[in-house]
């Protein structure tokens, strides 16, 4: 069941000031951005309408500091231990930095009290060796594990979609969906493929392992509204969902009773009482 709660974005970012946070945490420096040339730190950069559907694009999209700072904030504020990232880039650098900070601040407690076996790891998946090497060769990211996967057309409940194969065998508490692009899957489903300028990305990987995720897991999609709606229509467990239209972000939080003592400890430590307040609200939905 999906519980739509537009207040989730306010809960996730309570106390967050993007301009202050970007400066305090060196987000621009991490992303390789010159602040003197960037402009307003709090506003999104407008793109050419065809930029994201250009199959010949050979350069990464320009960094958006508002989005990157929010990702950094989420990792720290939710005491994230394990990240699964679909599509890598500047976000990978940001995740690495945030996980290093969490490792310094949290590892002693987490190692002794929680069942988290991929602690402070970001597992980043991409089907392009080029982009993996671009990040790997330019940055020393010791918390990042790179996964080169094939991208194939497939189906979920009869609906055409894409899958990465293989996937890393980890249990993330934060999933960031920013890949794949729509032009590179292999194969088709009865002639249907995402490889067309009028189509859009439609990844179904999360649906395959949804039943393994632990309560408290957060999914963030960067834009990809059609894909987010596909997830929303096919996720089977109890999720709190919010579309932040201004930021062009979608958030899904797995909002269920803890699975057991270790999951309860994780929720108490990472998310606190506000999680159980949301859970109580959802029961009246």
Language model features with spans:
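Conserved class I S-adenosyl-L-methionine
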Residues: 79-89
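Short SAM/SAH-binding signature in class I
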Residues: 165-179, 185
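S-adenosyl-L-methionine
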Residues: 128-170
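Residues in the short beta-alpha loop(s) of Rossmann-like NAD(P)-binding domains
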Residues: 89, 126-129
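A short helix->loop->beta-strand "cap" motif at the edges of active sites that frequently abuts
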Residues: 103-104, 118-120, 214-217
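Class I SAM-dependent methyltransferase Rossmann-like catalytic core
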Residues: 36-79, 93-97
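C-terminal substrate-binding/active-site "lid" region of AdoMet-derived donor-dependent transferases
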Residues: 180-285
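Conserved SAM-binding loop of SAM-dependent methyltransferases across substrates and taxa
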Residues: 90-115
